[in-house]
Regions:
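Intrinsically disordered, low-complexity regulatory segments enriched in Ser/Thr/Pro
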Residues: 90-123
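Short coil-to-beta transition motif at edge beta-strands of beta-rich domains
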Residues: 2-16
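Intrinsically disordered, low-complexity, charged/polar segments
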Residues: 41-73, 118-143
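Amphipathic, interaction-prone secondary-structure segments
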Residues: 70-100
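Short beta-strand-centered aromatic/proline hotspots
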Residues: 11, 18-35
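Hydrophobic residues embedded in beta-strands of well-ordered beta-sheets
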Residues: 29-30, 78, 101-106
Length: 146
């Protein structure tokens, strides 16, 4: 994953799987904050496309539920699990396959009478954050926790 593909506040990991939140992005480098359990910055970590590149954080049901998404057991079929998020005027549905299946993610956005569905080949936290920002849900995207 290249640094310029990311945005401020995106969640990434280092090569050891330690999650961090991006705080600075350049053309080929990025800086991420290491947060403690209370969400306080403990230190910063530098990433570079040529030496120490960032890795994506795999999206899971646990991460979704930490961020206000609700698991819909009645919509689960063929190994696909569904979660929903509603803030009053916007309703989102997200489908993730079982761990054994391909890492495909489907997001359904509904607002008033409009709806839009997008399929992604990978289920990563930063991809969900980017899509939430496209829907105008910047606060939800920027304040995600892993």
């Amino acid at each position: 994953m290249k640094c310029k593909e990311l945005m401020i506040y995106d969640w990434i990991e280092d090569r050891n799987g330690f999650p961090m939140k991006l705080s600075l992005i350049g053309e080929t480098h990025a800086c991420a904050a290491v947060l403690d359990v209370a969400g306080v910055v403990g230190s910063y970590w530098d990433f570079d496309d040529n030496f120490n590149e960032p890795y994506p954080v795999k999206l899971s049901g646990e991460i979704l539920e930490k961020n206000g998404w609700v698991f819909n057991e009645e919509k689960m079929n063929y190994g696909v699990k569904c979660w929903s998020y509603c803030d009053g005027e916007v309703k989102l549905s997200l489908s993730l396959p079982d761990e054994d299946d391909k890492e495909r993610m489907v997001i359904l956005y509904e607002r008033f009478l409009d709806s839009d569905s997008i399929v992604y080949d990978n289920a990563y936290v930063h991809i969900l954050q980017h899509q939430l920002r496209c829907y105008g849900l910047n606060e939800l995207a920027d304040n995600m926790v892993v």
